[in-house]
Curated annotation (Swiss-Prot):
ATP binds at residues 87, 105-109, 512. This is Protein translocase subunit SecA. May bind 1 zinc ion per subunit. GO terms for molecular function: ATP binding; metal ion binding; protein-exporting ATPase activity. InterPro entries: Helicase_ATP-bd, P-loop_NTPase, SEC_C_motif, SecA, SecA_CS, SecA_DEAD, SecA_motor_DEAD, SecA_preprotein_X-link_dom. Monomer and homodimer. Part of the essential Sec protein translocation apparatus which comprises SecA, SecYEG and auxiliary proteins SecDF-YajC and YidC.
């Protein structure tokens, strides 16, 4: 009560922020007449003037009124569009390291030009981040004329671009690209082998469009660059044949529960577990298939990899559904983003899950991957010096933005008041009744000429609604991951009178739905349109626009509630843009995933008490409240998961930053000999300590062991035992110095042969390769540690603290291994004279030619079979070992194909 009273007196924090910013808006408006008087050249010259003032020490913030006034005037001249006052407010919010919540249709793209221009003045670069390539390209091309008019360069960063083009894009003042591509470029830069290979500059200012989608929905998805691991595709196929024999166990509280299933499914946690009966059956089936020996257990240490395959196959069959979680296209399994309904080409599930789904669908199984580098979006975007974002729906997630990214959320008022009618939810007992009610609603509204947008949560659901509409004879467009290419075109025309469009989730975000359709799209479809044609198209559009307004604007139908209220609000936000009329309603059934998992008991109890008849709907504030509570439950659970993920990833992040910073320092220096000398001393000290403990008696020394170790690991053959026999007075310290001196002397002799410059280059290459190899192994070890660490809770230990402690110990051990491996590799390397190198190169070429010839002779995989075939082809007696090889290489059989048989 007291908080409400104080808010009334002083206004909310949001109100106070906007009140402060409105003073700056008044200043910008006051400058407008002055800006209008400037010629184009004078307006363009303002950019250089601002840059000069920043160089002299003025802050970027002090330029806000003038810079925003310049951009507004330039926009009027280039686009014929003037920034509204609310867009100026949005621009200031974005410059203030905040999230700007701006409703759909309020012109977020135009708003972004203000802070992008202002922050690019410092010359450090601005990254505008979008959710897909289409939007990145569209926004860059749309805004390019404005920025270039003001003397700013614009770059586009797209997947598959060559490194020089990427470097050019990043060198631009303002760069447009997708979140994935920025993250992958960061990882690739930290895997580069020369400074010239890097493409990014220092991360300065990121302006994230659809910030909720990127920083919240995708926060649990790490970006991973991986390389192929060993091939185990046959095992996935074998295990996949077994899974259909297993029966799913019903929930214990269900009417049909008998306790006879082979595996249970936890839909909330997305987990599958074998029951005791299931374990017995699967072990029998594995023995029958010859995959496991009789009498063995699936849980024995030797069968860990087999258990991994079984779990992956079970998850693929029980939790992942075709046309919901993935689609199969051109013999490939492509993931569908659960939040956007878009396909994610090139993304693969980890832990063998993708291979298990490929086996289930009978497509080619690709190799498992090993992680080479990874980062989460949470940690990537926190690397920027300055971060801001905009979206139509952020307020429900304001707490998360604040606690994880330290970003406040400011709700920017709309330019015109919102008049959309949001109707209460209708709840039906079954899915079929719900679909029927939706069809009736669509019939009724389209008969009056009202356009309808139907939002579904998966491709499968969109196709169910589509089939029913076809049966009812209603023309419609379907927009889902399968029809991704014509997305913008379908969305642009979804406002046509009586148009019916079915879209998964937020597909088509970023494209406005214009009431009456898009006249611009019609003009663009014509080749060289005349003035008369354009005038006619505009007149026709105006008539359609007025008809749709009279029919009540765009009507939104939600076929199901999403786990997150924010995504429901995004669907609603497609209607009622810029003060247009509109309406929305959600249709639910007790069979919907959200209702079944989180809200079923209370709501179905209410419905039974009310004595519902088939086809009847319940529409009651209690039900709406129960559903909202279910969504809150899911949201808070998902927030906890993301927060916990971040706490664990922060540990890895500190290590990643340390490794990447060390790696970049290494890349930027040309001479690492001082580092090599320093770590050589450390390595030899630690190695000698293992065999000659410091300050110990000679009887405790293991001289044969030390000699063997020095020979095997450092290619150093030293007669240490002889030294000690001949020089009884040789004490421990002198012995250490002599071993190290011998090692340095041997290394210097190698350097004299190849030259100092070549040796420095080689040292750097060895350090980089060893670091990358050990970091890759460390990432895998951290992953295994992370997966099992929760079990420490049973021992009354805090898993997070245990993870921090153990991962630090692993990191320290990795750094020690790095030193050892580098010195060992450099010591063991064989240096050749130029003539020897040339001879080896000739031999390598001959070997390559011989292999090429073998491939022509036979397409079989097994080279030993090639040799046997050749013997058979000659039709002669068995080839003697010293006979010429029949492949025609000119070598003896024993030195050629004979070696392989």
């Amino acid at each position: 009560m007291l908080i409400k009273l104080l808010t009334k007196v002083f206004g909310s924090r949001n109100d106070r922020t906007l009140r402060r910013m409105r003073k700056a808006v008044s200043l910008i408006n006051a400058m407008e007449p002055e800006m209008e008087k400037l010629s184009d050249d004078e307006l363009k010259a303002k950019t250089n003037e601002f840059r000069a003032r920043i160089e002299k020490g003025e802050s970027v913030e002090s330029l806000i009124p003038e810079a925003f006034a310049v951009v507004r005037e330039a926009s009027k001249r280039v686009f014929g569009m003037r920034h509204f006052d609310v867009q100026l407010l949005g621009g200031m919010v974005l410059n203030d390291r905040c999230i700007a919540e701006m409703r759909t249709g309020e012109g977020k793209t135009l708003t972004a030009t203000l802070p992008a221009y202002l922050n690019a003045l410092s010359g450090k670069g601005v990254h505008v981040v979008t959710v897909n390539d289409y939007l990145a390209q569209r926004d860059a091309e749309n805004n390019r004329p404005l920025f270039e008019f003001l003397g700013m360069s614009v770059g586009i960063n797209l997947p598959g671009m060559p490194a020089p083009a990427k470097r050019e894009a990043y060198a631009a003042d303002i760069t447009y690209g997708t979140n994935n591509e920025y993250g992958f470029d960061y990882l690739r830069d930290n895997m580069a082998f020369s400074p010239e290979e890097r493409v990014q500059r220092k991360l300065h200012y990121a302006l994230v469009d659809e910030v909720d989608s990127i920083l919240i929905d995708e926060a649990r998805t790490p970006l991973i660059i991986s390389g192929p691991a060993e091939d185990s595709s046959e095992m996935y196929k074998k295990v996949n044949k077994i899974i259909p024999h297993l029966i799913r166990q019903e929930k214990e509280d269900s009417d049909t529960f008998q306790g006879e299933g082979h595996f249970s499914v936890d839909e909330k946690a997305r987990q599958v577990n074998l029951t005791e009966r299931g374990l017995v059956l699967i072990e029998e089936l594995l023995v029958q298939e010859g995959i496991m020996d009789e009498g063995e257990s699936l849980y024995s240490p030797g069968n860990i990899m087999l258990m991994h395959h079984v779990t992956a196959a079970l998850r693929a069959h029980a939790l992942f559904t075709r046309d919901v979680d993935y689609i199969v296209k051109d013999g490939e399994v492509i993931i569908v983003d659960e939040h956007t309904g878009r396909t994610m080409q090139g993304r693969r599930w980890s832990d063998g899950l993708h291979q298990a789904v490929e086996a289930k669908e009978g497509v080619e199984i690709q190799n498992e991957n090993q992680t080479l580098a990874s980062i989460t979006f949470q940690n990537y975007f926190r690397l920027y010096e300055k971060l801001a974002g905009m979206t139509g729906t952020a307020d429900t997630e304001a707490f998360e933005f604040s606690s994880i990214y330290k970003l406040d959320t400011v709700v920017v008022p709309t330019n015109r008041p919102m008049i959309r009618k949001d109707l209460p939810d209708l709840v039906y007992m079954t899915e079929a009744e719900k679909i029927q009610a939706i069809i009736e609603d669509i019939k009724e509204r389209t008969a009056n000429g009202q356009p309808v947008l139907v939002g579904t949560i998966s491709i499968e659901k969109s196709e169910v609604v589509s089939r029913e509409l076809t049966k009812a004879g209603i023309k419609h467009n379907v927009l889902n991951a399968k029809f991704h290419a014509n997305e913008a075109g379908i969305v642009a025309q979804a406002g046509y009178p009586a148009a019916v469009t079915i879209a998964t989730n937020m597909a088509g975000r970023g494209t406005d739905i214009m009431l009456g359709g898009s006249w611009q799209a019609e003009v663009a479809a014509l080749e060289a349109p005349t003035e008369e044609q354009i005038a006619q198209i505009k007149a026709d559009w105006q008539a359609r626009h007025d008809a749709v307004l009279a029919a009540g604007g765009l009507h939104i139908i939600g076929t199901e509630r999403h786990e997150s209220r924010r995504i429901d609000n995004q669907l609603r936000g497609r209607s009622g843009r810029q003060g247009d009329p509109g309406s929305s309603r959600f249709y639910l059934s007790m069979e919907d995933a959200l209702m079944r998992i989180f809200a079923s008991d209370r709501v179905s109890g209410m419905m039974r008490k009310l004595g519902m008849k088939p086809g009847e709907a319940i529409e009651h504030p209690w039900v709406t409240k129960a559903i909202a509570n279910a969504q809150r439950k899911v949201e808070s659970r998902n927030f906890d998961i993301r927060k916990q993920l971040l706490e664990y990833d922060d540990v890895a992040n500190d290590q990643r930053r340390a490794i990447y910073s060390q790696r970049n320092e290494l890349l930027d220096v040309s001479d690492v000999s001082d580092t090599i000398n320093s770590i050589r001393e450390d390595v030899f000290k630690a190695t000698i300590d293992a065999y000659i403990p410091p300050q110990s008696l000679e009887e405790m020394w293991d001289i044969p062991g030390l000699q063997e170790r020095l020979k095997n690991d450092f290619d150093l053959e030293l007669p240490i035992a002889e030294w000690l026999d001949k020089e009884p007075e040789l004490h421990e310290e002198t012995l250490r110095e002599r071993i190290l001196a011998q090692s340095i002397e041997l290394y210097q002799r190698k350097e004299e042969v190849v030259g100092a410059e070549m040796m420095r280059h080689f040292e750097k290459g060895v350090m980089l390769q060893t670091l990358d190899s050990l970091w890759k192994e460390h990432l895998a070890a951290m992953d295994y540690l992370r997966q099992g660490i929760h079990l420490r809770g049973y021992a009354q230990k805090d898993p997070k603290q245990e993870y921090k402690r153990e991962s630090f110990a692993m990191f320290a051990a990795m750094l020690e291994s790095l030193k050892y491996e580098v010195i060992s590799t450099l010591s063991k390397v064989q240096v050749r004279m130029p003539e020897e190198v040339e001879a080896m190169e000739m031999q390598r070429r001959e070997e390559a030619e011989r292999l090429a010839l073998m491939q022509q002779l036979s397409h079989q995989d097994d080279d030993a079979a090639v040799a046997a075939d050749l013997a058979a082809q000659t039709g002669e007696r068995k080839i003697g070992r010293n006979d010429p090889c029949p492949c025609g290489s000119g070598k003896k059989y024993k030195q050629c194909h004979g070696r392989l048989s």
